[in-house]
């Protein structure tokens, strides 16, 4: 890895290398997703951990008390290190970049599905199965976004391809043809 990388990429790549060496890519994927969920769903937790007004050891104890046994020790050590170097604010970016490295190693492809209404688990599973066949992929991870502005149907973004079957696009194309 190049030495000109930014700290986020260095930390993320180090996490990835540990996961690879330990043969724990799947575990780290799960742990990184867990940390990301905590950051998004319980922001007060990382606000407390990042609060410079709190004693550093107190902040580390908060991490250990709440994450030990749930998250691999190397990831807890990373959080401790970020507390020490006053860079805990980088954690989310590091986690997302490490997930990119891990997903690439696991051959996980992400697909963005935009729909006008909430899809059921069954509908999502069927879409994923169809995409696996169409693109000859074993692992596809769907990201479902509800956007009422597309009116109906759905739009699928997979790598650099867009399959837009939204009602909004269909109507736009009809208007475009009539002009």
Curated annotation (Swiss-Prot):
Domain of life: Bacteria
Record keyword 4Fe-4S present: no
One GO CC annotation: plasma membrane
Membrane topology listed for this record: Peripheral membrane protein
Major subcellular location class: membrane
Pfam families: OSCP (PF00213)
Gene Ontology MF annotations: proton-transporting ATP synthase activity, rotational mechanism
Gene3D superfamilies registered for this protein in UniProt: N-terminal domain of the delta subunit of the F1F0-ATP synthase
Record keywords: ATP synthesis, Cell membrane, CF(1), Hydrogen ion transport, Ion transport, Membrane, Transport
Compartments it resides in: Cell membrane
HAMAP family for the chain: ATP_synth_delta_bact
Role description: F(1)F(0) ATP synthase produces ATP from ADP in the presence of a proton or sodium gradient. F-type ATPases consist of two structural domains, F(1) containing the extramembraneous catalytic core and F(0) containing the membrane proton channel, linked together by a central stalk and a peripheral stalk. During catalysis, ATP synthesis in the catalytic domain of F(1) is coupled via a rotary mechanism of the central stalk subunits to proton translocation.
Assembly information from the UniProt record: F-type ATPases have 2 components, F(1) - the catalytic core - and F(0) - the membrane proton channel. F(1) has five subunits: alpha(3), beta(3), gamma(1), delta(1), epsilon(1). F(0) has three main subunits: a(1), b(2) and c(10-14). The alpha and beta chains form an alternating ring which encloses part of the gamma chain. F(1) is attached to F(0) by a central stalk formed by the gamma and epsilon chains, while a peripheral stalk is formed by the delta and b chains.
UniProt family annotation: Belongs to the ATPase delta chain family.
Protein name from the UniProt record: ATP synthase subunit delta
Biological source species: Ureaplasma urealyticum serovar 10 (strain ATCC 33699 / Western)
Underlying gene: atpH
